[in-house]
Amino acid sequence: MVLKLGEASTIKDKRKVVLAIKDKLHHRYRLSCAEVDLLDSVSFAEIGAALVSNSPQFGEKVLRDAVSFVEGHYPVELYDVQTHYEIYG
């Protein structure tokens, strides 16, 4: 997900917000998260999240809930969300 960070004025401020989001997504939704792009931008962050599930519907629901949570609980504006899943077996 690509986020515009409204309150960040320095890279340090940005990293605090991004770290808080990643930690909350990990603990609340059991997602593996990382900042994957836009590392030098003060105003924008791109966070990637992943999970493994035996149900594509469950996986998509968890990711939708996580995106909604970020939008509702952090001073950010959502710019882009991309979902990709693979089925093995």
Question: PLM ranges: what are they?
Answer:
Residues 1-27:
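N-terminal first-folded block
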Residues 1-3, 47-49, 81-85:
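A structural signal for short, well-ordered beta-strand segments
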Residues 2, 8, 39, 75, ...:
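Generic secondary-structure boundary/loop-capping signal
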Residues 29-36, 77-83:
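Short beta-strand elements
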Residues 34-54, 88:
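Short, charge-patterned binding micro-sites
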Residues 53-89:
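C-terminal structural segments of small proteins and small subunits
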